[in-house]
Amino acid sequence: TAPHFGVGQSFLALALLECQDMKKLVALVATITLASTSVVACTPKPVSAEPVAEEFLQGMESRNNDGLAALTDAPSDATSALDATYSGLQAEGLDIELEGMDQDETLATANYKVTWDLPKDRTLSYDTQMTLTKTEDEWTVRWKPSLIHPDLGANQHLELRALEAKRASVVSSNGVELMSPGLNYRLVVDTSSLEDVRPTASKISGALAAAHRQDESIADIDAKDLAKKLEDADGSYSVTMFTEDQAKAVRPKVEGMDGVRLNEEPALVTRDRGLAPDLMSRVRSAVQDEVDGQTGWSISVVNENGAALSDVEKHAPNAAPSIKVGLDYDVQRAAQEAVNERSDSQAMLVAIRPSNGDILAVAQTEKADEDGDVALQGQYPPGSVFKILTAAAGVENQGLNTDSIVPCPGTMDIFGRVVTNYNAFALGSVPLSQAFAQSCNTTFADISTKLKPGELKDMGKKFGFGVEYDIPGLTTITGSIPEGKEPLERTEAGYGQGYDLASPFGMALVSATVANGKTPTPSLIEGHETKASDKPQRIPKHVLDNLRAMMRQVVTSGTARSMAAGGTIYGKTGEAEINEGSHAWFTGYREEDDIAFATLVVLGGGSDASVNITSNFLQKVDDYRSGPHKGAAPPAEG
């Protein structure tokens, strides 16, 4: 077999044949060897930078800091910047896709797409690039912050930041802001940090007593009671909550106490602290999940001091829409001021808008508050205000009208039950409208007795009375009417005695039905649906026409003729007798401003007490709506 010679060996063989002198041979071999080496060195192509780029990007994805450090010229800067961005973005994952390489012998550029997985299913995607250089046959990543994001400079990182949405206000039906976004402050004790809680309880009690002397709205706390609660607590214990104004008085007195802190909390702050505090508290509880709006977010370029320099992505927040309640600021103030004129009594007033069922006002004196939400839930004999329903039943079931002649003797014996008018007054035989206006008990006892069992109860439900309502934010009871299987039950029910029971809320709803033509669905918070046990029915026109005429006559020439408020007012008075005395009632509506009302003074005697309160109420409504202070709420109180 012929010998095989490589490129260098061929040159060498040729030289051996031609060289005759050994010195020349040695020199020639050296020359040929050098030439051979030069040829081999120029032959291979440059090695690709792509594997190094891919390894670096994989290290970024997996946060392999050791691997990254070995591939870049600034390992400490690279790893710290990447860690800062991971942390700043609260990143849940990172995906990087190499999209292309540009390369020559010693310089390469890698182009890639970066996608960050962020909390709450959010992502951030963008394109960027890195530069690699080759030295001594090795490719190295030249570190720049732009490897992470093209907008990053030295000592900068990316950061995910929440953009808080404007929180919702609570607005009255007449457009006044009742509650606005603000802050409350919770006094918290960390019991785990205290060996003995008793000294702390004593200090807190003393601090609050001192603050109470500055602001009477700050409640005192008994040191012994607090110590017992702290001893039973496990970890943090919430002592009480303060408004922003109250916290100003409390903070200097509790600062520095071991284990004690004031925590700031977002809250709906009442602008007028004296306005229906119980009602405002109920509204606040009902809408607390609706006030925050939709938080936005941004990705910012942030320096080492935490200052945001620019945004690389931004999603604006969506402010929560205002929450509207049926409460009317002017009507509520007027109602509260009116009942407070009888502060010595359990006086209360409920106002409803007949056209849509908005609960405009619920007002009670402090004495009434002692028994709870009696304006909405209290059950009292309604007395003669109930004659609205008896009259409606007589018109619909017995064919009566305002001109029908009915008996109104001073007393009437009905199946052994002697019914008596107030002071036994007697009118003789008179039109139904006059008997209604003068409130003849005997007339309506007679009408009711002649009804069939259940007819009066059914009529009540047509006016919302006896219907069960589930009103978000409120608990209410309208009232009850007996079935009337026994004649005596029907007799007493006809003029609001016996087993008839009513709340001011229930009677306000009856008057609202007369005004509207069918029972409006009562509601407190717009968008919070009220559920009712019975579907409202439209009252026949002839029934409404007769009722309206009779209720108007009560005010113009009947038992409510002392009404001094302006406007076209319809009503019915009532004095409900009980063993201890009698309750004073008045219910009705004013045509011009779409207000139905019911007023009750427990043990108030004659109905004049409630007529006077209602008259003052309507006059105050007019004053508020026409005066310079119209709809003016004070600044938000902390």
Predicted regions and their residues:
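N-terminal export and membrane-targeting signals
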Residues: 15-32, 45-46
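Small/polar-residue-rich segments within soluble enzyme cores
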Residues: 113, 140-144, 148-150, 158-170, ...
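Exposed beta-sheet edge and beta->alpha loop/turn motif
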Residues: 103-162, 550-553
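Short pre-catalytic segments that frame enzyme active sites
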Residues: 147-164, 179-189, 194, 198, ...
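Conserved SxxK-family serine transpeptidase/carboxypeptidase catalytic domain
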Residues: 43, 92, 97-99, 105-106, ...
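C-terminal motif of bacterial Sec signal peptides marking the signal peptidase cleavage site
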Residues: 39-41
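Short solvent-exposed beta->alpha transition segments
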Residues: 45-51, 65-111
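Beta-lactam-recognizing serine transpeptidase/beta-lactamase-like catalytic domain environment
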Residues: 347-378, 393, 397-603
